[in-house]
Amino acid sequence: MIDDQRDMQVDSVNQEENVDSGETKQNTVTEVPRTVLQDVEANIAALMQATKQRDPRLVYRSLRTTSNICHRLNADVLGQLIKKYYSFDNSLKNELLELIDMPQNGDDSSTSITNGNGNTIFPEVDMYLQLLLSMTLYYNEKYEVGAEYIKKVIARLQSYDRRTLDQIAAKLYFYYILFFEKCNRSVECRNTLLSVHRTASLRHDSETQAMVLTLLLRNYIQFNLYDQADRLVSKTSFLTNASNNLAIRYQYYLGRIRAIQLDYTTAHEHLVSAIRKAPNTVYAVQFLEAVYKLHIVVQLLMGEIPERRIFRQKSLEKTLVPYLRISQAVRIGDLCAFTDALSKYEAEFRFDGLYTLICRLRHTVIKTGLRMISLSYSRISLRDVCIKLGLDSEESAEYIVAKGIRDGVIDASIDHSNAFMASNEAMDIYSTEQPQQAFHERIQFCLALHNDSIKSMRYPMDAHKSELEGVEEARRRMDKEMAEADLDDDEPDLGEF
């Protein structure tokens, strides 16, 4: 009996193991990676659901995977999608098939997708497929063909008036400006973008409005039209509910405009905000390179030295070498090293569009060198100052020393008769208001970060109503208990005192 029971237990354990192994095998079989066509079909189904429910969040979920899908697309998949969703219009279908060099089959038996109102395709699905085709043309470097094609797409997009098209339209306008930039025709887009921005503001299309605003600033900065960009910023407002990528681009463009206008403190705040909000992914490396380059120059113009950890980041180490040389020259106040670095990396600085700002650093280098001389020597001749700073004459050294004293760079005096500079005793910085101001700036930043974090949180809909109902229920229950207490006659008579 005992042996039989043991055999039964062993058999039951083996059966359970077989069942578990069968389940794991079944799970491994079901976990099959989806094809590109299935991913596109899933996004299209989500777009159709978003159209019926009028929920823009479903559109956002569909667009999140679009960039990954686009790099996996090929002509066969696009041809299947075009034949399926544009079977109602042979002329449009043939035009789209020509763009991807796909042969046209006359006997196509694909069924068209209707939206239930007599139309043959949802506008959201139509624009999504046009977006996929535009991205494919761009990544295949067919810029001239793509520029002419996307003009027709934009004209077709403007014929629709759907709130659910907001995020797809923003993507289309982004590739619209990219195509024309590659063809050196971005000036042609300016009037179109201005009219689109006005229309988006009237319709309250937040994503399109934010995207077009950043594209206009990009266009103005590309042609050095900083005054027009500043007027555009002053007459418009950036919506807070726009996506994070648009917000950091807007902050970067604002920082660039303010730096050109000599407002380095405001530019520094915008650039720090862009760096902190930027995603730490591979796709954001080039954007971070541009932001860090401008941020380093702005810091140097403010009289600050960038931290060395910025130049030691693996993804930015090679591209920031020219700016490291400039920072080292500014830190030690070596005008000769600064001039050598400026001439050696002039091509890189002009390509980044920062050559003008870096040329302004010459005065900063001279001031830094003058400050170090003042701290090192209690008394030094103007001729030695001229030699150490690499100036042309003693008159130039005397002028620079006098200007440094007037601007508060150094605390010294000039003996014109004997031609020397005498430094005064250094004052304790903790006796001034500078530590208090620095501490105040840090507190302000922490408070602003706390407020932004609270604003970015998502709260459940009508949560306050449930709290009010709970308070009302508690109040009714308390009133009922008080009424029952008044009707209670079981208390003993206290009598007379």
From Swiss-Prot:
Compositional bias annotation for Basic and acidic residues: 470-483
PCI domain location: 248-428
Pfam hit, one: Rpn3_C
InterPro entries: 26S_Psome_reg_C, CSN3, PCI_dom, WH_DNA-bd_sf
Gene Ontology CC terms: nucleus; proteasome regulatory particle, lid subcomplex
GO MF, any single term: enzyme regulator activity
Biological process terms in GO annotation: proteasome-mediated ubiquitin-dependent protein catabolic process; regulation of protein catabolic process; ubiquitin-dependent protein catabolic process
Function, as annotated: Acts as a regulatory subunit of the 26 proteasome which is involved in the ATP-dependent degradation of ubiquitinated proteins.
The protein, known as: Probable 26S proteasome regulatory subunit rpn3
